[in-house]
């Protein structure tokens, strides 16, 4: 488990390129037949990936010991979105088939969660966010057909994109975790511009569906002290509440956003005018 400490905005603005990457970038999300796990002190979110290839991968008691509990989800909820081939997730003996871009919410109290791929030639890639939970909500599968896509932006401003809200109150109940998937239309490069912050939530972006020769310049920092982190395919970045989170790519891309914090009101954000950015 890779533990990341919280960081003050006044400290963050003094960091060089490598310093910013050390604090906020999750460089390796998927490793064959293993789970990766980054624990952030910011709202206690855990971020990572699970890619079973030649065997199943389970997450249970061994992780619990690192969290000071008996098992991983004793006091946590889990959100998973599969960006790879078809797979299965077994929760408490019940097996869920999770296809490409299907998702599974796992409620607090699930003692063991087992991940598997259907075809080793095209393994599943389970990206997950995990947050503290105060009560148990039912485990539920969510498919792309069950989300309500919202298309925003314009080709003229190069930010035409479709937002798919997987784990939001309109779809299912969670304690605090919200997750969704945003896909840019071909030829569009910008996400979340004009940008915003949200004082009551932190957020993690996971960029994927990118060619090897492509990258995204992820914008972060306070609106008057912006910085950037260069992101490549299948990498994640942690965004504190005080930071903007936006990006521009060399080609179109897709990203998963996950938020935890005080509320789940999607529109509870502090907008920043482009003219006010520095």
From Swiss-Prot:
Name the UniProt record assigns to this protein: 4-deoxy-L-threo-5-hexosulose-uronate ketol-isomerase
Similarity comment: family membership: Belongs to the KduI family.
InterPro entries xref list: KduI, KduI/IolB_isomerase, KduI_N, RmlC-like_jellyroll, RmlC_Cupin_sf
Any GO BP annotation: D-glucuronate catabolic process
PANTHER family: 4-DEOXY-L-THREO-5-HEXOSULOSE-URONATE KETOL-ISOMERASE
Coiled-coil ranges (or none): none
Pathways per UniProt: Glycan metabolism; pectin degradation; 2-dehydro-3-deoxy-D-gluconate from pectin: step 4/5
Role this protein plays: Catalyzes the isomerization of 5-dehydro-4-deoxy-D-glucuronate to 3-deoxy-D-glycero-2,5-hexodiulosonate.
Entry keyword Protein biosynthesis: no
Reaction equation(s) it catalyzes: 5-dehydro-4-deoxy-D-glucuronate = 3-deoxy-D-glycero-2,5-hexodiulosonate
Cofactor: Zn(2+)
Record bears the keyword Cell cycle: no
UniProt KW keywords: Isomerase, Metal-binding, Zinc
Assembly, per entry: Homohexamer.
Source organism: Escherichia coli O127:H6 (strain E2348/69 / EPEC)
GO molecular function: 4-deoxy-L-threo-5-hexosulose-uronate ketol-isomerase activity; zinc ion binding
EC number(s) recorded for this UniProt protein: 5.3.1.17
UniProt binding sites for Zn(2+): 196, 198, 203, 245
Pfam family, one: KduI
Cofactor remark: Binds 1 zinc ion per subunit.
